[in-house]
Every structure is written in structure tokens, then in C-alpha cells.
């Protein structure tokens, strides 16, 4: 195991983290005791291997660090911590941050503008987040900044850039792409009908296949009851990729009623 110079007595530090308190958020309460224990073990390894860097006066404490690590590891609970090996630092601003964005239009002209971002990730680069939106990721609303950026990292394991198609068997790529684009078109149809703000799925999912995969990954873990019945074929593909079925966790929770069932095949 790599020993990072900024991590001294890392095992002792992680053991002292308030894991029970960190787990006490709506997103994680439906995990079984066994799943919670395995998630904590992954989160401990995550904190041993990654550096959390607080920026612009933001202050990290033990509970914040533990919750951030748990959210990073939820998507790879069944995949393994090695799926997060494409970065070493997580930079955390207190609020959404401004970046200089460069883009090329349809006729080849390059434009520069300053834009506000909630998070960013690059191939072999750090993940950048902001605490304001991380806090909004604790519930089961369909929004989760950390899962969104982790999905981009998982996506980029299949090539130099995010494409919306993660590392899956080659024989499944065409079907995955077909179902993903069908979902994008369906979301766009709803946007055209009711507008972006009234769309039941974040309108950002309709902009690009990579963003569709990332946004629907947010819904997969935090609002499966919205994702599964609307896009059942794509839901099964997500279950097969992540090797999890969050909808079954909802069904097994006695506080949830009338939850449709789904099974990983």
C-alpha cells in the first residue's frame, strides 16, 4: 500500500472517525448492516489513498471527511476501491466556484468565458467539489454531486474522455448506447413539453451521453424509484454495471410502500 507523506498514523485516524454518525443520512440508511460495514472498510482505504484538500477557508472535520469518503465509495461498493485509482486528491471549495471555460462552436471558433461550476473531474486529475452541494447530496432526492463526479471517473476508465459508456463487455456496448440515447431523447421530450425546471429528471442529462450517465447514476443511487420504472432496460444495465440494486433496498425498507421491484440479471 502506498504511504502518502501527509497521512501520519492514518489507520488510527480512520478508526477514530465517527462512522456511525456519518452513515446516518437518508442516502445510506437502506444499506444492510453488512453493506454498511463493507462501505466503511472501503471508505477507510479511500482516506488512506486520497488527500482531501479544503480550499478558500473551508474547514474539514472528522464527520465531513467520513461522509465524503462514504459517498465516494458507494458507487464502487461491489466494483472495488481500485476503480477509484484515477486520482489522488479531492479539492473542496465551500461553495460553487468560478472557472475559465474554453469551448469550440459548430464553425470552429474558440470561445472563452467564466462559468460557475459545482464540480469537475479530469482523466488522471483531481476531483473538485464544493461543500454546499455535497451537503445537498446526503438525501434521497436524485441529486448527488459526489456520485456524479465519480461516475465521470468510472466512465473515463473506458478511454481518454467520458463517453457515457463505462467499462463494460464489448458485446453490450451497442445496446447500452441505444438505451442511453433513448433515455436522453425521452428526457428531452419532457423538457420540450414542460420546460427544464419542471422536468422530473435533471435536464442536464439530455445535453450529452457522458452527462446522461453521470446524472442517471445520481438517480440510480438516490432516487431509484424515479429511474427504474421510467427506463427499465437502462436500469438493468446500470444494475449489471454497478452490481447493485438500490431499488431492492427501498423495497426491503419497511418504511417504504408501493416500491416497484427490480432484479439484477
UniProtKB/Swiss-Prot annotation:
Primary location: cytoplasm
Location(s), subcellular: Cytoplasm
Cofactor binding: number and manner: Binds 1 zinc ion per subunit.
InterPro entries: MetalloPept_cat_dom_sf, MtfA_enterob, MtfA_fam, MtfA_N
Enzyme class, spelled out: hydrolase
BP terms from Gene Ontology: proteolysis
Enzyme Commission no: 3.4.11.-
Quaternary structure note: Interacts with Mlc.
Name of the protein: Mlc titration factor A
Originating species: Citrobacter koseri (strain ATCC BAA-895 / CDC 4225-83 / SGSC4696)
Gene (UniProt): mtfA
